[in-house]
Design a protein with these regions (language model features):
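Short active-site loop/helix that positions an aromatic residue
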Residues: 1
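FAD-binding subdomain of flavoenzyme oxidoreductases
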Residues: 4-7, 11-158
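Flexible, glycine/charged-enriched surface loops at secondary-structure junctions
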Residues: 7-11, 163-192
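Short, intrinsically disordered, charge-balanced linker/junction segments flanking boundaries
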Residues: 16, 193-199
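A conserved active-site cap/scaffold subdomain adjacent to cofactor or substrate pockets
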Residues: 144-176, 197-199
Length: 199
């Protein structure tokens, strides 16, 4: 994607070793992604048990891969499709409301929480209850410049004030943001260097 000046939903990967893109969609992952929000798509290919107890293949990915389940999965695996087979229906491939929700610092509910019914659709938020074969997700324009800021304080109220100010008043939201408590920071200074190198 770099050659197109684009980025995927997450460029930081996951806090879980071995996590996958599909797994991220299944769990609506992306808690640190302030600007893009949790992984979400309405375009996916998956198998599930229907209300009659029968295993079925659901092709919501909007790519013409054939008619039968075997044909669809074979063409997907062997990449037997072209741009002409790809359709662009009026469906979401990201959470297009998240920025508005995360800026609402006075809301009664958090911007992101588990099992948010607003973002449960097909593979999105399925939490492993179906077998997902493929997903389509939006990409994002790569920023020309980025800057990382580390902010430390002994007063949690100071962080709350900074967070509210950024979300309410900044023209552009941060790409991502993460909290580390003191014990975590102190431990990282001494431990886990080998894990970092391996990953």
């Amino acid at each position: 994607m770099l050659s197109y000046g684009r980025e995927p939903h997450s460029v930081i990967g996951s806090s879980c070793i071995g996590a996958s893109i599909v797994g991220g969609v299944c769990n609506n992952s992306g808690g640190a992604l302030v600007k893009r929000g949790p992984a979400y798509t309405e375009l996916s290919l998956y198998a599930k048990i229907n209300s009659k107890g029968k295993l079925i293949l659901v092709n919501d990915i909007a790519i013409d891969l054939g008619e039968t389940p075997k044909e669809i999965l074979t063409n997907l695996q062997q990449r037997k499709y072209s741009e002409n087979h790809i359709k662009f229906p009026d469906k979401l491939a990201s959470d297009n409301e998240y920025q508005q929700r995360v800026r609402d610092v006075k809301a009664d509910t958090p911007a992101r929480f588990n099992s948010d019914g607003r973002r449960l659709f097909g593979a999105s938020g399925c939490a492993g209850k179906i077998a997902v074969f493929a997903v389509r997700l939006d990409t994002y324009i790569s920023p020309k410049r980025t800057q990382v800021f580390y902010v430390g304080t002994n007063n949690q109220d100071a962080f709350a004030s900074i967070r509210k100010n950024i979300l309410s008043n900044f023209k552009n939201l941060p790409i991502s943001g993460e909290y580390l408590h003191r014990e975590c920071y102190d431990a990282a200074k001494k431990y886990s260097k080998d894990t970092f190198i391996v990953i």
